[in-house]
Amino acid sequence: MLRIAIFGCGYWAAFQVAAWQVQGAEVVALWNRTREKADAFAEKFHIPHVFDTPEEVFDWGEFDIADIITDAPAHEELTLLAASRGKDVICQKPMAPTLEACVRMVEACKKAGVWYAVHENFRFQPPTLAFIDAVKSGVIGKVLHAEITMRSPDLAIMEKQPALKVMPHMVLRDMGPHIFDVARAAFGEMKSMYAVPVYSYEGIDVPDAAICTLRADNGAVVTCNLVHEWNDRFMAQGEKGRIVLDHDNVLHITTDKGESVIDTKTWNYLPYIPQADWELHGGHIMYSIPICIDALMKAYKEGVPAATNGADNLETIRLVFAAIESFDTGRAVEI
């Protein structure tokens, strides 16, 4: 059985730890900055060992993977610590607050020979997986234009995660890793970025929405919209047809041979997730967490890089910081 040590027990950690346990891993150790919170979390999830410092977790060392679920500013230090102790590591997104830190993390894990992945769950939503598979099948030929629309943090989400209200370039740092990862998974690498920020709420001085236009290496124009939609909507226009994932999570594939319609709502309610959180984020998002965990576990057990391995996710992070540069300069940025 895979043994996991958890670092951090904030809002998303509860869903992630439950997913590990449901998927058959054993969560054996926990560290959090606040010991009282760690003790309560460990009792709730039956985690046998709680430590006062990260170093103590690694000194104990009876685990396979360090799962880092802290706030982003702590990711680099903990990842480098794991690499220095020869421990495989999974890091929550975003990988780190700066591109330079992300590069150091990837290089340190590569040098140490440890398995390194990023917990990037959005590409594992059932509707998103169906859309990516349809695009990659070649049924519509070469993609000419695509549009990806995802929900950005609105007031309800910011109340759950108040740090978002003061996070510089908030919408890009919070949702950029998700939407750009999906764009890359579906349409390949990108070579340019133009991003426009949107400020929706009086008294909140960080951007909560964004419109980003990217040019893919293969020539496709990909528009990434981070707006206050409830459900995602994706579209790809190709030389031979069109693929649309609509607001009801129904996939429409239209070619000269006709239209195929596929209902991608394949998830069921997960009873370990509070109903309020399920309704706030949507079942498609919450269900992606155990799917992502399962994909990470399979890759790890097979001894192969995860789809969201550190080196791959670094390319997504480059897009995030290109978008930030475009925000700040008002100009398109070459990747």
Regions found by a protein language model. Name each.
Residues 1, 25, 65-70, 295-335:
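C-terminal helix-rich "cap/oligomerization" subdomain common to oxidoreductases
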Residues 1-45:
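N-terminal Rossmann-like dinucleotide-binding module
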Residues 6, 34, 45-108:
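Beta-loop-alpha module in the N-terminal Rossmann-like domain of NAD(P)-dependent dehydrogenases
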Residues 51, 90-91, 116-118, 147, ...:
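Hydrophobic residues in well-ordered beta-strands that form the structural core
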Residues 104-121, 141-145:
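Rossmann-fold dehydrogenase core element
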Residues 121, 240-311, 335:
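C-terminal glycine/acidic-rich active-site capping loop/insertion
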Residues 122-203, 330:
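Predominantly a Rossmann-like dinucleotide-binding segment in NAD(P)-dependent oxidoreductases
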Residues 174, 180-254, 290-304, 322:
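Contiguous beta-strand/loop segments that form the cofactor/metal-binding neighborhood of enzyme cores
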